[in-house]
Each structure stands twice: as C-alpha cells, then as structure tokens.
C-alpha cells in the first residue's frame, strides 16, 4: 500500500506530465508569435523575453481548454488557436496584478515589475493585451457568429469579474489596515470572482468542442470550483513561505485561514493589535501556531473539502474523459 507521501508525489508527477503534454505546444506558439513583431523596442523586447522564457510558464490555460473540450467529445486541435491569444491575455493580467500587489519577487524569481520597474511592466502588459485581443479577433472571424459572440461574452465577463475581484480585494485590504474587521466570507467573494477566469476557460473549451448547453454550464461550474481550490491552495502555500506571507500582510488581503483567526478579535480596535502582531512575527511556525490554535486551518481545509466535493459531484454528469478532471481535483486538495 502506498504511503500518503508516495501518493502525493504520484499525483503531482501526473499533473506535471499532463501540463507538458497539453500545454507546451500552444505556449511555444504564443512565444514565437510575440517575437515576430519587429516593431518592439529593445526595452519591451527584453522584458517580454524575460517574462515569456524565464519567469512565466503558462501551461495551465491551454491544458484547461483542452480538457474541457475533450470532456464533451472534442479534441485538442479545436482549442489550439484560441489558446494562444488567451495565454497572452493571461500573461498581461499577471504582470499588471504584480504591480497592483507590489510583488517584486515570486517563488524566488523577480517579477517583471521587480526587474524592470512599473513603467516597463505596464507597457509590457499592455503589449500582451493588444497582441492577445488582435489574435482573438482573427480567431472570431473564423467561427460561426453565434459561437464567436458567445465566447466573446464569456471572456468579457471573466475579465469584469477579475477587475471586480481586484477592486474588492483592495477595498478589504484598506479596511483591514484601517482597523476594521474583515470577515472570511468577504474574502470568499473575492475568491469566487477570481475563479471566474477558470470558469470561462472551461465554458470556452466546451463550446468549441460542441458541448450542449447543460455541459457548458456544468463545466463552467467545475472550472469555478477548480479556480477557488487553486486560490485556497495558494493561500496555504503562502503560509509556508515567510517572505510571501510577510508581503501579503503588508500589501494584500490576508489568507482565508488568518481571516478566520482574526474572528477571535471581535472588537474593531483589536484588529490593529492583530495586524501589528502578524507584522512582528519572525518565523513561519509562529503563524502556523496562530492558524491552528484559532481553528483557522481547520476551517480552511473544511472549505476546500466542501468545494472539492461539489467539483467531484459534477464529474458524475459528464460523459467523456473525466479522469484528468478528477486528477486536478485530487492534486489541488493535497495538503
């Protein structure tokens, strides 16, 4: 019988292999197309080269499109061409998000903002947006009008949700640092909105694969749950990374588990005390003491289990190639 550690490694390796198999070709195509533009100045070209080849490796976008398409009986080829512009747009959002969050480094690597400054980062993100939407428009012209219109509305809605999520997160962060209590349920709204992009990817894949209205809706719901699990898993990972969690305490909203811990401080004036305490922490273990003793970690894991259960239940109503969709849920619930 395999140990929990061996099972975790097996699932992780399967997901890595899946991402490489489904995502590598579209990602490389996106990289090649970007650098065909000869009008890019050296400063932007350097930033793009760093971002696309050294910092960022978006295998996720094309993989999720592919899995959704296959889940309704379609093939990877049907989503190949839309994956390229969506990779670019996703990259632009990532660059701009780092500026908003003042993130100069992630996972040991400098962000574009951290390496080149805010001005170059903004322009680089804008370039990717323009390139992405230009290619997206070309793709629309090759589709039946009803499909292109449907996909366009989904993409716009996903972008609006992301924008609303950022605005709400900034509002909650300011509220927290002004000594007001932020409830975990308020942050959960941010998580649900941020998961809108994954919801959108799964709907698009299902549309291009010829899925029924019911299948498109189901896969969108699955994508929403998957996106929420990914964010909550990142929250837990941040709690293990001292540099990242100190940055979040200073510039971003607290992870869900810490907001649950904050509920022990019912009086608004005590929120200052809690934030001051978090800023004074010198070791990751001290943070874990807080989230464990306050039941914050327990509530965090219970939330993830509840969301995962909803995701698994959706798989019962899908007809094709559900194995990889289950694998992703298994991976995101590893702790």
Where is each model-derived feature located?
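Short, well-structured alpha-helical segments
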Residues: 45, 49, 80-83, 152-159, ...
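Acidic, Mg2+-coordinating active-site segments of isoprenoid diphosphate-utilizing enzymes
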Residues: 67, 72, 95-116, 133, ...
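Aromatic-rich carbohydrate-recognition surfaces in CAZymes
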Residues: 118-129, 135-136
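C-terminal charged capping/lid subdomain of soluble metabolic enzymes
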Residues: 5, 285-335
């Amino acid at each position: 019988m395999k140990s929990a550690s061996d099972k975790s490694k097996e699932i992780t390796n399967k997901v890595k292999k899946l991402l490489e198999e489904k995502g590598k070709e579209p990602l490389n195509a996106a990289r090649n197309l970007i650098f065909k533009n000869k009008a890019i100045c050296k400063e932007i070209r350097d930033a793009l080269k760093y971002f696309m080849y050294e910092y960022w490796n978006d295998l996720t976008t094309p993989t999720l499109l592919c899995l959704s398409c296959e889940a309704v009986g379609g093939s990877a080829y049907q989503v190949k061409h839309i994956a390229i512009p969506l990779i670019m747009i996703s990259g632009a959002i990532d660059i701009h998000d780092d500026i908003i969050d003042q993130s100069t480094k992630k996972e040991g690597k400098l962000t574009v903002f951290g390496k080149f400054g805010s001005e170059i980062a903004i322009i680089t993100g804008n370039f990717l947006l323009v390139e992405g939407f230009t290619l997206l428009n070309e793709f629309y012209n090759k589709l039946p009008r009803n499909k292109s219109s449907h996909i366009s509305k989904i993409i716009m809605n996903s972008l609006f949700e992301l924008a609303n999520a950022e605005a709400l997160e900034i509002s909650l962060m300011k509220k927290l640092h002004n000594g007001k209590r932020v409830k975990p349920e308020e942050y959960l709204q941010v998580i649900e909105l941020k998961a809108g992009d994954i919801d959108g990817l799964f709907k698009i894949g299902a549309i291009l694969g010829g899925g029924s209205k019911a299948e498109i809706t189901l896969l969108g719901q699955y994508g929403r749950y998957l996106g929420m699990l990914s964010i909550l898993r990142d929250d837990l990972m941040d709690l293990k990374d001292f540099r990242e969690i100190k940055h979040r305490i200073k510039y971003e909203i607290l992870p869900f588990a810490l907001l649950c811990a904050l509920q022990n401080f019912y009086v608004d004036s005590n929120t200052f005390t809690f934030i001051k305490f978090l800023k004074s922490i010198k070791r990751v273990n001290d943070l874990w003491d807080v989230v464990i003793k306050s039941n914050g970690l327990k509530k965090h894991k219970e939330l993830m289990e509840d969301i995962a259960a909803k995701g698994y239940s959706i798989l019962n109503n899908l007809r094709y190639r559900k194995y990889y969709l289950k694998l992703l849920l298994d991976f995101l619930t590893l702790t």
